[in-house]
């Protein structure tokens, strides 16, 4: 899927251009993306590539445009300018699990893809997230972590080329969050989608990502490869990029 949006004459030149280092095919490519809300520019001539199998974490202060970018990639928000080349229907997992309370777990997982996923595919996806045998259970019987596991199963049930994660672990307790991190890493390695994780948690980004981006004023301001730094050194760098004094 390619979406082109007319570029306004006053669009700024991108402040940061990424050079791909991974030979895998692109899962998504963004060029010159711009989004305005009235006079306020939320995304400013942004460029971004994510490759198949690459896990990218996006950090930034509240209001810098992270979620707006994710929604644009998901097709939930139309930019004012630029181009998006992305799978026609990427999968999205939000902070809230968004399960339908009147539908069983397998029906929630297969929602919108009943023909291609079906009960059998939903059962396999639920088994992958540790909920085997609970296909006919109801969302009301789940803990917060279990409900988010179902949301993740729904996101991966049809093997998407692009998986978008909008702070999916933010509402979970610390222990459940750690368990979910391990599960996500395992599932991404198995399914091999390109992943964009929007998060405020530097440590979460360090744990999960192959590449960490910092967004500032609607642009990608910095990009880091975790393997080129020690975790402690990169943590300090990222906190400084975010305007936080590290201890």
UniProtKB/Swiss-Prot annotation:
InterPro entries: AAA+_ATPase, ABC_transporter-like_ATP-bd, ABC_transporter-like_CS, ABC_transporter_ATP-bind, P-loop_NTPase. It catalyses: ATP + H2O + aliphatic sulfonate-[sulfonate-binding protein]Side 1 = ADP + phosphate + aliphatic sulfonateSide 2 + [sulfonate-binding protein]Side 1. Keywords: ATP-binding, Cell inner membrane, Cell membrane, Membrane, Nucleotide-binding, Translocase, Transport. It is found in: Cell inner membrane. Its main location: membrane. Pfam families: ABC_tran. It comes from Paraburkholderia xenovorans (strain LB400). This is Aliphatic sulfonates import ATP-binding protein SsuB 3. Its EC number is 7.6.2.14. ATP binds at residues 60-67. The complex is composed of two ATP-binding proteins (SsuB), two transmembrane proteins (SsuC) and a solute-binding protein (SsuA). The gene is ssuB3. One of its GO terms (molecular function) is ATP binding. The keyword Transport applies. Gene3D superfamilies: P-loop containing nucleotide triphosphate hydrolases. It is an enzyme of class 7 (translocase). It is a peripheral membrane protein. Residues 28-242 form the ABC transporter domain.
């Amino acid at each position: 899927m390619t979406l082109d949006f007319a570029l306004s004459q006053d669009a700024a030149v991108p402040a940061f251009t990424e050079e791909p280092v991974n030979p895998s095919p692109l899962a998504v490519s963004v060029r010159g993306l711009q989004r305005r809300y009235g006079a306020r520019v939320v995304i400013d001539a942004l460029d971004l590539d994510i490759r198949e199998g690459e896990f990218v974490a996006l950090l930034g202060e509240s209001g810098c445009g992270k979620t707006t970018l994710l929604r644009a990639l998901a097709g939930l928000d139309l930019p004012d300018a630029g181009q998006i080349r992305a799978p026609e229907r990427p999968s999205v997992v939000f902070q809230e699990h968004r399960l339908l309370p009147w539908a069983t777990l397998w029906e929630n997982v297969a929602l919108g893809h009943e023909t291609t996923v079906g009960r059998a595919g939903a059962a396999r996806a639920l088994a992958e997230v540790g909920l085997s045998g609970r296909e006919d259970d109801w969302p009301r019987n789940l803990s917060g972590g279990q409900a988010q596991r179902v949301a993740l199963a729904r996101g991966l049930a049809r093997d998407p080329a692009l998986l978008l994660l909008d702070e999916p672990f933010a509402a979970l307790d610390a222990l459940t969050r750690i368990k979910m991190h391990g599960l996500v890493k395992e599932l991404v390695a198995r399914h091999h989608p390109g992943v964009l994780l929007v998060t405020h948690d530097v440590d979460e980004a360090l744990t999960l990502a192959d590449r960490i981006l910092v967004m500032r004023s609607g642009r990608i301001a910095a990009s880091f490869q975790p393997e080129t730094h020690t975790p402690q050194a990169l943590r300090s760098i990222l906190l400084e990029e975010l305007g936080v004094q590290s201890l």
